[in-house]
């Protein structure tokens, strides 16, 4: 069953964050990951939304998503994200 990695971010260093954007997708592909929503303006329907960006990536299973998150391929992009943005990541099951 497909799962979704959802990340909410506030960019602190837009110049260096471009390196993250360039490297993250290649790190996901080996694990069957792909973006289904990435960046762009967020249209808040209710309440407060604390972050300026939302990213949703689809993986074929929770195991593949966790393998990617802990993988050597994602190590450099993860370090870039942590250095250039405040973020939260969760995994949710698809239906």
Task: Identify the residue ranges that each predicted region occupies.
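Short S/T/G/P-rich N-terminal loop/turn motif that feeds into the first structured element of a domain
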Residues: 1-56, 60-70, 74, 93-95
């Amino acid at each position: 069953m497909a799962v979704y990695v959802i990340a909410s971010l506030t960019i602190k260093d837009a110049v260096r964050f471009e390196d993250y954007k360039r490297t993250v997708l290649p790190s996901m592909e080996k694990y069957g990951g792909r973006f289904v929503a990435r960046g762009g303006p967020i249209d808040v329907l209710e309440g407060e939304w604390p972050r300026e960006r939302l990213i949703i990536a689809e993986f074929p299973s929770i195991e593949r998503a966790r393998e990617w998150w802990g993988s050597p391929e994602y190590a450099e992009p993860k370090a870039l994200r942590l250095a250039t943005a405040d973020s939260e990541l969760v995994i949710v099951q698809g239906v």
